[in-house]
Every structure is written in C-alpha cells, then in structure tokens.
A protein has these predicted regions:
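Generic structural signal for residues in well-ordered beta-strands
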Residues: 1-3, 111, 173
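Conserved active-site and cofactor/substrate-binding residues in soluble primary-metabolism enzymes
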Residues: 10, 14, 39, 66-70, ...
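Rossmann-fold NAD(P)-binding glycine/threonine-rich loop
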Residues: 41-55, 147-199
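N-terminal ligand-binding/catalytic initiation module
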Residues: 1-28
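Anion-binding alpha/beta catalytic cores of soluble intermediary-metabolism enzymes, centered on
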Residues: 28-82, 123, 138
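Hydrophobic residues at beta-strand termini and immediately following loops
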Residues: 4, 57, 114, 176
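Glycine-rich phosphate/diphosphate-binding loop of Rossmann-like nucleotide-binding domains
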Residues: 8, 24, 65-152, 157-170
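Generic recognition of short, well-ordered alpha-helical segments
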Residues: 14-17, 43, 99, 187
Length: 200
C-alpha cells in the first residue's frame, strides 16, 4: 500500500489527473475525505474506476461502501438477529446512512432513516438498534437510550476524538476511537483483496 499526500492548493484538475494515472498501478484506490472546498468530491471519486473503488463511494461501484459494510459484518459477527428488528439510523449521508439503510433492509430489518427534521425521540424509544452518524459530539447524550448504539461520529472535543454519543457510562455504545473506524479499515482491506482476485 502507498499513501500519497498533495498540497492543499492542488487543483481539481491536477488531483483528477493524478488519480487517473495512479489507478493504472494499483488494485484499489481511495480518496481520503474531506477534500479542500475547491475540489468536488464527485469529480475525485469519478476518476476511480468502479472495479477499483474499494471505498464503495461511486454509485456504480463494484463494492459496498466500507463503513456500512463493516458495521453490518460486525453485527453479524455479534449474532445480531436482523429479522423484524427496529433499526434507527440517524444521518442520511450518501457515504454512511443511505447505503447502511439499504444493507440492513436487505437483512430484513425495519429501518428508519432519520435526519435533522425527524422527531427522534419517537423513533429512538422503539429501537432495537441505533446507528448515529451525525458528526456532532454528544448528540445522543440527551436521549434515554435502551438499546445498543453504533457510534459512527468523528468529533474533536478539547483535542480528543469523541463520537456522537460519549460520556455515557453503562450504555452499550461502540467506542470512539477504536470502534467503527477499525471496522472500516478491515473492510477496506477485504475489498482490496476482492478487487485483486476479481479484476487484478
């Protein structure tokens, strides 16, 4: 594996050109987000061929997005019984929320995808599982939660990395750091191996 760093003033054209060059030499390529505001994420991702998009960001990617797939695989490993379970996903991004809802629906869970206008307390109370991917430190702390929580949040408070649900003693919450981020990296590696086997 190789990591390439580029100056923040790299233009969109230069980055896309570099990606199109690098994909010739690797089985899998990913772009670390966020990008500087002058570079469109869509343009950078589109430069990666679908069979090498191991992060699963393209709509036509040959791979499921790494973070959602890592979460589902982890819950499978833990023995989570999907059929008929009420799952609330808070955050409807194209990278986590929406693809995760699709994967969990395919497992026969009943999924509610919430956003900033949702009345969360109604959904949270009835949930068998909550996934929070808001990106707001302590977002869930004010809600009475009686089920497991998968915390996808990445936030910094006083220089420390924390999730969307932290300082919650006694709650069944995946840790940040050391939780979903590790699952994402593991799934990325699995996708790279698959890319090599299928297309290498």
């Amino acid at each position: 594996a190789e990591v390439y760093f580029y100056p923040e003033n790299t233009t969109e054209f230069e980055l896309v050109d570099e990606i199109e060059h690098l994909v010739e030499f690797y089985d899998g390529v990913m772009v670390q987000l966020p990008l500087p505001p002058h570079i469109r994420v869509e343009a950078a991702i589109a430069a990666i061929p679908k069979e090498k998009d191991v992060d699963g960001f393209r709509r036509d990617s040959c791979f499921d997005p790494a973070t959602p797939l890592g979460i589902v695989n982890y819950l499978d490993y833990c023995g989570f019984e999907w059929t008929g379970k009420e799952v609330t996903i808070i955050g409807r991004s194209d990278i986590v929320g929406k693809p995760l809802a699709r994967l969990m629906t395919n497992k026969d869970a009943t999924v509610t995808l919430c956003h900033s206008k949702s009345k969360l307390s109604n959904h949270i109370y009835d949930s068998d599982l909550i996934v929070c991917a808001v990106g707001q430190a302590g977002f869930l702390n004010c809600y009475p939660i009686h089920c497991p929580v998968v915390d996808v949040g990445i936030n910094f408070v006083d220089g420390k990395l924390v999730g969307d649900c932290y300082n919650t003693d006694g709650r069944n919450v995946t840790p940040v750091p050391g939780g979903v981020g590790l699952l994402t990296r593991l799934t990325l590696l699995e996708n790279v191996v698959k890319a090599k086997e299928m297309y290498g």
